[in-house]
Amino acid sequence: FDKAVNLIFDMHNEYGFKAMKETGQSNSTFVKGLKQLFGERVAIFSLDPQSTRARGVQPDHEVYISYDQVTVDDVATLQDELKLNPTAVESAYLVYAIYKDRWLLTLLAQEGPDVEEFAKEIGAHPGSLVALHRKLKRLENFPFMVQKGHADGDVVDRIMEYLDRGINVVLEFGQQTSMLCYLLVANIIS
């Protein structure tokens, strides 16, 4: 019976608790989600707990990702989405070589002309680092991004604990529907 578990990336909030029926009718009829159907065998993790609660659902876990969980390889896989040139990714590796897990926080903490000065200090091309900085600043708009780890611990570890216990996980994105958000979270979790 319980031979497999699922990790569902629910970008449109359709699988967790309930979803609007896909009929042409204007009435707001809902269909049950996995949590209503399978109860404790499903856990809802939310990147946007405010949105989840606004739909009348209490998430099992709120998802927070700290900047130190984002690797340069995660950014490299986002190269097309962020429209980064290869030298910008190389610049990220230069920042990482010096600052390790704090590379992203250190980079994003730079402001204005400080970014060019920072580039010179680490031996990166100033234009590349400025472009990388500008494009990665978008991550600061994601409410689930935090400077330090959250009290619940590492979200990847928490999801794996649930899956190991045979509990299916629905990861709701709430209002966070950009492709950048989806790809970033998928990279970090997988």
Describe each region flagged by the PLM:
Residues 2-8, 12-190:
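P-loop NTPase motor domains
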